[in-house]
């Protein structure tokens, strides 16, 4: 038993009581062509898709950086250490961008480049977003948008040429090169591909010229709600109060037919540029993204952490799995263990199961057969150290301190 527990301890990730609410993975980064592509983040000779995803994570979670998704359809997919719980009546996801309000216009917006938000719950717990798990956040422009939209970008013979696009509505145009940005606009780690095709939802144009034809002043209007890079990150001048306009309510999710979906939570978020539009000398609309954050947190700044007392509603989970997960009967195979800051490990069982606590020497410190329903293992009275908590075959390594 001791050898088995030592081996198990080596395999289990360490769970400490402070878990960051910020995304900790970039699963894929696939921008469409654009004026900031290969710059934000910087592509260097030899960088492949994996290297660029790693750079995207570094840019997004570093200080003062963001990534560009390029023209319509370009996207980034991120994951989290903890599921973002869908809390009724609350906005659950905060997405930082680089939108700002124009000081010279009364129009709501200025530099708003809205990105469509997709969300997914990890139904099969495989750690990656499978195709059938994605749901769109239906923002304020959902009914005014073109759905099942598709754009293909054609790689030109030279990196100095504009890049042609064609959509499935019979339209075509160009991602135009502009004097301020002279690098290649085609993602260089995808240089072996002659065409890039994206599918999704095309939002309405949001560009307004508040100047004249000879002296244009372009304002990119903000939509009411439900998009990334649509509102400034903060609602106060000191940058202390997060702007609710930059937040997403998971309850805005819809399926492919536009029907509302009640998700228990979100493990993955995908954001893609939602407006296919060129803005004169400003170039194409290109959504920019910084951090994606779980709003259900405690503390501030570097001390901010996920509020582990907020857990998934098991009834909502059961109904979601029954409808979308192909689950006919529920058991403990998808059990999740939650650890809060007091040292309480909580879970919900669909059938009775054994709960145990071990130290790193393999000694069993606690063992109890737990009934169906909500259950808890309390580590608050234990000495500081590392423990293995095992429930129904699921094990989490917890640092008590």
Question: Predicted segments — roles?
Answer:
Residues 126:
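Acidic carboxylate motifs that coordinate Ca2+ or other divalent cations, activating on Asp/Glu
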């Amino acid at each position: 038993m001791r050898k088995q527990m030592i081996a198990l301890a080596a395999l289990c990730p360490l769970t400490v009581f402070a878990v960051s609410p910020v995304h900790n993975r970039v699963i894929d980064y696939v921008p469409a062509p654009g004026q900031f592509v290969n710059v934000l983040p910087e592509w260097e000779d030899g960088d492949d898709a994996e290297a660029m995803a790693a750079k995207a994570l570094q840019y997004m979670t570093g200080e003062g950086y963001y990534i560009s998704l390029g023209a319509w359809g370009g996207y980034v997919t991120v994951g989290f250490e903890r599921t973002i719980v869908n809390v009724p009546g609350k906005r659950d996801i905060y997405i930082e961008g680089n939108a700002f309000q124009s000081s010279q216009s009364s129009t709501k917006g200025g530099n708003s480049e809205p990105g469509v938000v997709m969300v997914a719950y990890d139904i099969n717990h495989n750690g990656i977003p499978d195709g059938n798990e994605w749901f769109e956040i239906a923002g304020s422009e959902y009914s005014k948008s073109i759905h099942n939209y598709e754009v293909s970008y054609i790689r030109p013979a030279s990196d100095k040429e504009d890049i042609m696009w064609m959509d499935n509505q019979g339209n075509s145009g160009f991602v135009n090169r502009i004097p301020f940005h002279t690098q290649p606009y085609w993602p260089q780690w995808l240089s072996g591909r002659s065409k890039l095709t994206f599918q999704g939802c095309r939002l309405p144009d949001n560009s307004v010229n508040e100047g004249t034809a000879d002296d244009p002043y372009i304002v990119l209007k903000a939509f009411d709600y439900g998009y990334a890079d649509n509102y400034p990150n903060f609602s106060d001048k000191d940058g202390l109060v997060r702007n609710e306009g930059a937040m997403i309510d998971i309850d805005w999710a819809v399926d492919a037919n536009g029907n509302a979906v009640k998700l228990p939570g979100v493990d993955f978020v995908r954001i893609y540029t939602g407006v296919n539009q060129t803005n004169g000398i400003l170039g194409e609309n290109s959504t920019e993204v910084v951090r994606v954050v779980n709003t259900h947190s405690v503390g501030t700044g570097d001390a901010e952490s996920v509020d582990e007392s907020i857990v998934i509603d098991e009834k909502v989970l059961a109904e979601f799995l029954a409808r979308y997960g192909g689950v006919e009967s529920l058991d403990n195979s998808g059990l999740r263990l939650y650890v809060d800051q007091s040292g309480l490990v909580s879970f919900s069982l669909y059938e009775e199961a054994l709960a145990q606590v071990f130290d790193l020497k393999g000694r069993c410190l606690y063992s109890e057969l737990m009934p169906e329903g909500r259950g808890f293992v309390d580590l608050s009275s234990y000495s500081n150290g590392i423990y293995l908590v095992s429930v129904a075959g699921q094990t989490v390594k917890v640092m008590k301190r």
